[in-house]
UniProtKB/Swiss-Prot annotation:
GO molecular function annotation: oxidoreductase activity
Name of the molecule in the record: Protein FixC
Binding positions for FAD per the UniProt entry: 8-22
Intrachain disulfide bonds: none
Cofactors that this protein relies on: FAD
One Pfam family here: NAD_binding_8
Amino acid sequence: MTEERFDAIVVGAGMSGNAAAYTMASRGLKVLQLERGEYPGSKNVQGAILYANMLETIIPDFRDDAPLERHLVEQRFWVTDDTSHTGMHYRSDDFNEPAPNRYTIIRAQFDKWFSRKVRAAGAIVLCETTVTELALDAAGKVIGVHTDRAGGVIHADVVVLAEGVNGLLGTRARFRKVPKPEAVALAVKEMHFLPEEVINERFGLTGDQGCVIEAAGTISRGMAGLGFLYTNKESISLGIGCLVSHFAATLESPYALLDAFKNHPSIRPLLAGSEIKEYAAHLIPEGGFKAIPQLFGDGWVVVGDAAQLNNAVHREGSNLAMTSGRIAGEAIAAIKSRKHPMTSDNLSLYKAMLDKSFVLKDLRKYKDMPALLHTNSHNFFTTYPQLMSQAAQNFVRVDGTPKIEKERATTAALIKARSRWGLVSDAVRLALAWR
């Protein structure tokens, strides 16, 4: 192995790493993929949402054999206080299309399937292999990797860093800084197992239809965070995540937060009688556009979570990961076909292609949103949810109080909680961050 040279080494076998490895291998490049887990997906027991369009671009016939759980036909958005939720949902029969747009998946199963596709495309995949550091030449160019296996350096023309948000290779090589606590969320998740027919009945589903619930409000106890519930075939993925900086400041327990969420009056009936078999914690990049590090250099590129490519506003991550991996693979293959060296100047093609994609266009649009939610979390995740719940209950409760008095009471509660200036300021800041 030490005497063998590769066109590319991919570090990591998650969504972005698999997309990059598959793209390059399917174009004839000699690719080595290194994964520290026992198998791809071994550290990803949780459920997730798969965005079909992005995978279809890479593997057009993926639906033939991919381990898909349910196709999503309904999306629910909840704003919670301690005893209720106010929300909206969208459900459409259009989502029962021949090639559905979104699916729920179990990452452990899906990542193994994706890795088999990578191998079939011609890449070599080595698991239980930790890359300890990048190998650099005298000029500082990446020329390969050092691993915990015997044999020294494994050489390659370029290294793709797909090591996740807390990967150490880029920081050790000083290609990027350690992500700030306010740019990373910690999500804790559980898998609740129920019979398929019970899930269908509780959520009003048939066949392999699926439903997603996303909730924000007092469930995060004043922190910037989100709760979620995904329906799988015979299980429910439940979780909640908040900024690491807020966990540190409040000393809230992630486990206690999850326990409170699953016992919320709106959630508890959906989980009744379930058996919990799996628990996981996961770090998620939340810094947005302003937290994106340098994406390329001499002999290296960075993709997916390691590049902070996550759209927190729309809760999209796997699609950005797959797309960035694919684009990195396409850029490297194009440079290789021209017989150009993998220099920083040439690898800037990756960034140029990413700039033209939805990935950076979307992240750039919401560049100010992470800071707004981080610095104003109590109002957006406690004050306003409580006021919304009070207003909704006031609206639907029929008790003989004149409607004009109810409207005045709702307005007075808003002004008392935030003041007129506070309300205007929050609305303007939110509008500016959203535009």
